[in-house]
């Protein structure tokens, strides 16, 4: 928040952000994606090392492959946004994440390391299309209140991640 905004103006700014349907859609999309990342960070060692008996020596390769895919898709995103509307790229990222989540769910009933690994790579990798685009699209509506909007994004990300992680 810049300048000396009064409490009333601050409340108005928060209300403006929280009631903006399009912006909240972007905020929720980045928040649910953020939750998926938290769950991956929290559960991946159990899934790979305990469930699939991946050694402690090999686990960093499995974990790092997911991060590498996210980096690759972030770099691809940087090129794509020069010519393609960020909302279309975001949509593609969300679709990729949902498809990957469905495969994870389906494969979990008859899990093998290969199907889970490939599904996880695309699930985590999709964040490269989601994070930057959803943030930019949400903040686009709040040029004067970008600090407030950014704080709403941060709080929403952690609240949703906390609730989903707890479940």
How should each PLM-predicted stretch be described?
Residues 42-57:
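Short amphipathic helix-loop junctions that connect adjacent transmembrane helices
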Residues 61-70, 157:
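Transmembrane alpha-helical segments of major facilitator superfamily
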Residues 87-134:
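C-terminal transmembrane helical hairpin of 12-TM major facilitator-type secondary transporters
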Residues 1-27:
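Juxtamembrane intracellular "pre-TM" segments in multi-pass secondary transporters
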Residues 72-87:
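Helix-to-loop junctions at the C-terminal end of transmembrane segments
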Residues 125-128, 135-167:
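A late C-terminal transmembrane helix in Major Facilitator Superfamily
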Residues 18-39, 121-125:
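Pair of pore-lining "gating" transmembrane helices in MFS-fold secondary transporters
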Residues 53-64, 151:
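Small-residue hotspots at the loop-to-helix junctions and early N-terminal turns
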